[in-house]
């Protein structure tokens, strides 16, 4: 039986028991990372793939491109502006501080690493992925303002980090004397051409689709296909002219949302669904190739130390700093700081980096990112349900506090649901646990 056949069986088996696993805080990413590790080179070796395999790179890149476009087109800039400022603080102050702190510690922890490679590690691990801790943004016990801020942050920070990752990859390659010495100009060229592709595909394409829809020329199916095609065209078009496809996908999604004024959110879900399906495969590839690399090499302590710091100090201290003046409770600051899971964007960024820096820095980068994501998949996955319930219960007892300020309900993106079986099932369990008092206690069900 081939590796892909076995993987398909795993997918079917997971769908049959997903709700049961959900009750035990076992998430989709956990299942598929474990399956990949077992089936990959470090295990049964029935998935004959490598990190440089063209199929692997294509699948992961297109998955991120689809999710960047769909996220950016639905989590619009208006969402950032509509709150009291929490998403803006996290995105435009917290993200740069996180990268700065991560770069500094990487430079200190890894001997011989240059400033560009240190900054690259930090930028790769800066974006968050709400799918790994879905209970945090769906549990109604958590104040809507907090859920909304974390949801918007997760939806936009991978796209915002992409230009920095592009810049640092070019700088790190030049630092190792394997890249273009004019790395800054090359990176700026990629960013500029990506914006051109985004305008042409995202904005003009969105205007044309909205124009056709208003005149009744489209159908629901044709709109879904058109949006998928635009997402792929933004990515591939940018790559074809020498631009960065991910920047084009993200910027194209923003411009598409602006051009259509949010009136095509429902058809966008088709693109999200494809991204969700592909994300299961990406998590399996992460387990097979990234985790597989760890299983076949000697244990190194420094990457583990950095991984722990990345999930704690490097994330939590900047979040605490940018939330000064918001009058949020210390428990809220700690809650928001802890729930910054690292996921799919970091996987794809690492593959991109490894294509350019395959020398001394590549192994250290791979181990560091792998340990960080692996720990995040497990720790954020198992801690999200109980901590969300306990935090929500503690806030519910408080009076009129800033956490309870009015805010719009966050839109839960479909690919976030990869972390849990279904929102409907979760809500049903929340209702039951509230009635029995389990929600406040965070008791693990038997």
Please name every model-derived segment.
Residues 1-445:
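Transmembrane helical cores of multi-pass secondary ion antiporters/exchangers
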